[in-house]
UniProtKB/Swiss-Prot annotation:
NAD(+) binds at residues 276-290. This is tRNA uridine 5-carboxymethylaminomethyl modification enzyme MnmG. NAD-binding protein involved in the addition of a carboxymethylaminomethyl (cmnm) group at the wobble position (U34) of certain tRNAs, forming tRNA-cmnm(5)s(2)U34. PANTHER family: GLUCOSE INHIBITED DIVISION PROTEIN A (PTHR11806), PROTEIN MTO1 HOMOLOG, MITOCHONDRIAL (PTHR11806:SF0). One of its GO terms (cellular component) is cytosol. Belongs to the MnmG family. Keywords: Cytoplasm, FAD, Flavoprotein, NAD, tRNA processing. Its cofactor is FAD. Pfam families: GIDA, GIDA_C_1st, SAM_GIDA_C. GO terms for biological process: tRNA methylation; tRNA wobble uridine modification. GO terms for molecular function: flavin adenine dinucleotide binding.
């Protein structure tokens, strides 16, 4: 079938949540003509759940997005009300930044960025159909019967895809925050042959700030020391009058209220059918699963400077409204709190992610990409990371350039995408530091070193960011070289100085770099013996030097593992491989290979249920085929 289009674009992005804005901005900045279509422009980059960006693993993802040339880091640095570095008492691999956002300002600021972006058309429009010819995407059709042509389409519909909100025994069609649900498009994706799943997530009630008794809660202030998500942000712009959060707890009375009303809880009455998030369960689920716990933490998080709404983090629920009120009033500090918004659960359709390539393009339809909660993830950061990769690859496909695949050793974004396309997910997927086997090289402090050259190569990193990066990289390289050459000798004067500082004296000569490997020796101490750098070093360069030097042995071991895995990743598997033709392979492995259709030996080796023997047989089979082809040639 041939279509007549009302307008033509290179890339169309469907949905303007956190995935959609990153996808559309990336493609537009790479020179493509882009349409960003969304049901409601007021919901662009909206935060329907928690008013925060970052956190464990997620904060590193935001840094990675920024390093590649994405927008989330810059946007939150302009709109936060509190900033805090997490896990400071632990090793550098798990440290991550978290910001409380002014959620209205965050969305408004991002909307201004999108509106001003060259090559990007923003349109309030509901897309009902992905138009496909000969298994290739050619455009979209809207609810108003407008047809827009495109060489690539990125679907980032979030929880709107056949969304249904649930509160007690009330269930109605809706996207997040009572926006319209996208039902016709959900039907269309299924008709196109994509396998669809059904997930559930939820949000807690909001209470009025002036009705909270803060004296009964524990204050949670932000950090005084400047920290930023974007590598472009400056310390002098760090917010001084930050707004605190507050900590309180559930108690036995709270738990009794929930237990006495479980028969009215949609999760337990059978109303909720979708699979919920393991790492962000509802309060009723927590009370049942962790019956031995006599209390659970609740954080009271302001939703912005110009609003009275406070998000009760940890109290996600779909209990009936009257039960939610009773529950809130059982909590210390909230005895007289006024509930402004009711908590709710939302069920929605997802595209099962094993159907995707590592570029986030569907295997079934050329030019059709999906990203964000559409792929079964949870969280704004996970969505934004996928949106960025999908937008980059949509642009590269249109431009006829090589695709971008972030490996597990490149970024947490790469870990997430590999997990999704290789293992799939049976529940809303959340990034955790424990998912990354190379986490010591995927740190908060080195995201730019890892990814800014990649962003530059694909055309997303502009001259300003590139020059800032080069200055930092050159400073780091020069000072690391100097510290590797400058020596401390075990002479009397040096050892007396070391002992005066309370440290063990030298027995052998060593470089300043070797001296810094001692746990107690930081950069400032080392330079007392070898002198300062020839230039004033940025504090972030010093932080990077200390981490790279102190953990060098562990980092090198990780890099050795990366090199071994790289060899596996370079061994490609033909798209048209006949899995039934491989003798002796285990039945479970054959079934998994058929379902996922891995692209490399490395990916095949990470599929659950596939053992080393299966991989050995597969490699022998591929080598035999290669030899046969070489003889024919």
């Amino acid at each position: 079938m041939s279509y007549e289009f009302d307008e033509n674009f290179d890339v169309i992005v469907v949905g303007a949540g956190h995935a959609g804005v990153e996808a559309s901005l990336a493609a537009a900045r790479m020179g493509c003509k882009v349409l960003l279509a969304t049901i409601n422009l007021e919901m662009l980059a909206f935060m329907p759940c928690n008013p925060s960006i970052g956190g464990s693993a997620k904060g590193i993802v935001v840094r990675e997005i920024d390093a590649l040339g994405g927008e989330m880091g810059k946007n939150i640095d302009k709109t936060y009300i509190q900033m805090k570095m997490l896990n400071t008492g632990k090793g550098p691999a798990v440290r991550a930044l978290r910001a409380q956002a002014d959620k209205a300002l965050y969305a408004m600021t991002m909307k201004h960025t999108v509106e001003r972006q060259e090559n990007l058309t923003l349109r309030q429009s509901m897309v009902d159909e992905i138009l496909v010819e000969d298994s290739k995407v050619v455009g979209v059709r809207t609810a108003t019967n407008q047809k827009y042509g495109a060489k690539a389409v990125v679907v980032t519909t979030g929880t709107a895809l056949r969304g249904e909100i649930i509160i007690g025994d009330l269930k109605y069609s809706s996207g997040p925050n009572n926006s319209l649900a996208s039902v016709t498009l959900a039907d269309n994706l299924k008709e196109l042959g994509l396998e669809i799943g059904r997930f559930k997530t939820g949000t807690p009630p909001r209470v009025k700030a002036s009705s909270i008794n803060y004296e009964e809660t524990e204050i949670q202030p932000g950090d005084e020391k400047p920290n930023h998500f974007s590598f472009l942000s400056k310390d002098e712009d760090y917010l001084q009058d930050q707004i605190p959060c507050w900590l309180t707890y559930t108690n036995q009375e709270s738990h009794d209220i929930i237990n006495n009303n479980l028969h009215r809880a949609p999760m337990f009455s059978g109303i909720v059918k979708g699979v919920g998030p393991r790492y962000c369960p509802s309060i009723e689920d927590k009370i049942v699963r962790f019956a031995d716990k006599n209390r659970h933490q609740l954080f009271l998080e302001p939703e912005g400077r110009e609003t009275e709404e406070v998000y009760v983090q940890g109290l996600s629920t779909s209990l009936p409204e009257d039960v939610q009120k009773e529950l809130i009033h059982s909590i210390k500090g909230l005895e007289k709190a006024e509930m402004i918004r009711t908590g709710y659960a939302i069920e929605y359709d997802i595209v099962l992610p094993h159907q995707l390539r590592a570029t986030l393009e569907t295997k079934l339809i050329s030019g059709l990409f999906t990203a964000g909660q559409t792929n079964g993830t949870s969280g704004y950061e996970e969505a934004a990371g996928q949106g960025l990769v999908a937008g980059i690859n949509a642009a590269l496909k249109v431009q006829g350039k090589p695709e971008l695949i972030l490996k597990r050793s490149d970024a947490y974004i790469g870990v997430m995408i590999d997990d999704l396309v290789t293992k799939g997910t049976l529940e809303p997927y959340r990034l955790l530091t424990s998912r990354a086997e190379y986490r010591l090289i995927l740190r908060h402090d080195n995201a730019d070193m890892r990814l800014t050259p990649i962003g530059r190569e694909v055309g997303l990193v502009d001259d300003e960011r590139w020059n800032i990066f080069k200055i930092k990289k050159n400073q780091f390289d020069r000072e690391l070289t100097r510290l590797s050459k400058e020596k401390l000798k075990p002479i009397k004067e040096t050892n007396e100085k070391i002992q005066a500082l309370g440290f063990k004296p030298l027995t052998d000569a060593m470089t300043a770099k070797e001296f810094m490997r001692r746990p107690e020796i930081d950069y400032a101490t080392a330079t007392q013996f070898v002198g300062p750098a020839a230039e004033d070093l940025d504090a972030k360069v010093i932080e990077l030097l200390e981490t790279e030097i102190k953990y060098e042995g562990y980092i090198n071991k990780a890099l050795d593992q990366v090199a071994k895995m790289k060899r596996m990743e370079e061994k490609k598997i033909p798209e048209n491989i006949d899995w039934d033709a491989i003798d002796s392979i285990a039945t479970e492995a054959r079934q998994k290979f058929k379902k996922i259709n891995p692209e490399t030996i490395g990916q095949a080796s990470r599929i659950s249920g596939v053992n080393p023997a299966d991989i050995s047989i597969l490699m022998v089979y591929l080598e035999g085929n290669n030899k046969a082809r070489r003889k024919v040639d």
